[in-house]
């Protein structure tokens, strides 16, 4: 998708770019597939900040996306490609043969009028979803499940793609976008193709206000705070940390491991930093 670069008519416009959205074919979302989305400004149910630098932003409705692809054997026609403010990828509106409508992530190359389907025995074609055991080696996939029936959890961002590299017993080895190679159960579903909107990574935000519209607040350096607010704060003028770097809560930062390994780490064949 082409990118529109603005002329530097103001300091904020300088170096700003936007997508042209030529792939979008429908502006208003399907009313039956949206629901209200309450803002939480990064707070949990106790009001404690769990995600920093969030708050404000434009009002959004949540689009209900079918990550499970569990309508097996029923063909669906792509009715529209739409914008989704809640994710970097575009979404495709499907009209199933039985009358149901659903949204899926729009893969690269999927067009209005295409026919997609899911389930065992579906053709190896962009937009179709199959169990990993039926997908040939070397095939590019996205929206990958980690547990059968749970719905896709991996490889969902714009331009993301994983590749099937091996099949051993009941597990399939996938090369993920990070370079990590990971075992996933062969009964897990995955969708053929690469997630669309490849040029998302080439867009330049250009100004702080545009980031505020997205719901992101400023990230303040610890050294600019007071010692009450951050271990790096205080001092006259610019001062060195005088200690190994710390998080705002006093934990070691910048390279120090502070978490236990997950039990699921045993499914990692090669870590991303070994690639």
From Swiss-Prot:
One of its GO terms (cellular component) is large ribosomal subunit. Keywords: Ribonucleoprotein, Ribosomal protein, RNA-binding, rRNA-binding. PANTHER family: LARGE RIBOSOMAL SUBUNIT PROTEIN UL2M, RIBOSOMAL PROTEIN L2. Part of the 50S ribosomal subunit. Forms a bridge to the 30S subunit in the 70S ribosome. One of the primary rRNA binding proteins. Required for association of the 30S and 50S subunits to form the 70S ribosome, for tRNA binding and peptide bond formation. It has been suggested to have peptidyltransferase activity; this is somewhat controversial. Makes several contacts with the 16S rRNA in the 70S ribosome. Pfam families: Ribosomal_L2, Ribosomal_L2_C. One of its GO terms (biological process) is cytoplasmic translation. Residues 221-275 are annotated as: Disordered. The keyword Nucleus does not apply. Transmembrane segments: none annotated. Residues 254-263 have a biased composition (Basic residues). NCBIfam families: rplB_bact. This is Large ribosomal subunit protein uL2. Belongs to the universal ribosomal protein uL2 family. Residues 227-239, 264-275 have a biased composition (Basic and acidic residues). The keyword Flavoprotein does not apply. Signal peptide: none annotated.
